[in-house]
Amino acid sequence: MADENGGIFMPKKYNTIIIGGGTAGLTAAIYTARQNKSVAVFENGIFGGQIADSPRIENYPGFCEISGDEFSDRLLKQALKLGAELIKKRAAAIKLEGKDKYVISADGEKTQCDKIIIAVGTRPRPLYLENERELLGRGISYCAVCDGAFFKSKTVAAVGGGSSALQSAKLLAELCKKVYVIHRRNEFRGEQRLCEELKSFHNIEFLLNSEIKKINGKTRLESVLVKNNLSGEETVLQLDGLFVAIGKEPQNEIFAEVTELDENGYIKADESCKTSTDGIYAAADCRTKAFRQLTTAAADGTVAALSP
């Protein structure tokens, strides 16, 4: 490879490159660095991952309670202390040349390694309704922790039935005048303790067996059309904010050429985190697995780093 002066140089080579700087990625970096192996972590967003947005973590062993921001910060500092290198770039592709592996960043730079661990996590699943994308950031959000404060003393809705949706609803209820909690089923899938906590808020109204069918607004969110799936009744809710927390979906499109994906877009990997391609591993939420929790993300990061 020639440099700008016509000379020849080799791209920097690491033992391991990790794509994704969340819990799994940073755990893998910690374990790789502790083996005295060179390791770099590619992350275009926030090092620490989506858990940094969680106001409170209560289900990670050893911590009765810790904020997501503090948890992520501790992981990051530990990885750095052990010698992991952080590369604030988006990994755009993986290129295989014989036994050589390269991660290509969005700016076209190639970084060589012997082993790749994919730990990109997932992205919020949208409602897939007209106007949703256009009004994102204009009343629609996928992160109550990030954006909830903008809606203080206003009327909002939280959509979803898992723990993330319930946590969002609780945070919003502490800030907002009125919070509608919209869920398509009759019961919530989230932690029962959270459900009981929400019932104590006088400003929360539950709309169960209900779905949003239409989003209204030109330059900002104005209202949503909600349909009760049992009665068929439709109601228009005037809203200042809509917080969507209906789960996650994979973001593995760029890896489809070098790893096998399942029918839902998750990377096929066994319990050693090995993919269909030698030397490429997939850890945590981006891979096929039964459970996607903070603890299983850390476990996958460990396994992927230690697997030969």
Model-assigned labels for residue ranges:
Residues 2-13, 141-150:
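A short, basic/flexible loop-to-alpha-helix module at the beginning of a structural domain
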Residues 128, 134-150, 246-296, 300-303:
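FAD-site-proximal beta/loop scaffold in flavoenzymes
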Residues 21, 120-121, 246-247:
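Glycine-rich, N-terminal phosphate-binding loop of Rossmann-like dinucleotide-binding domains
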Residues 14-82, 160, 164-191:
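Beta1-alpha1 glycine-rich phosphate/pyrophosphate-binding loop at the start
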Residues 13-15, 88-89, 152-154, 209, ...:
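Phosphate-coordination loops involved in phosphoryl transfer and adenosine-cofactor binding
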Residues 6, 79-105, 110-111, 173-271:
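A Rossmann-like FAD-binding core segment of flavoenzymes
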Residues 86-150, 161:
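Glycine/small-residue-rich loop that forms an oxyanion/phosphate-binding "nest" at active or ligand-binding sites
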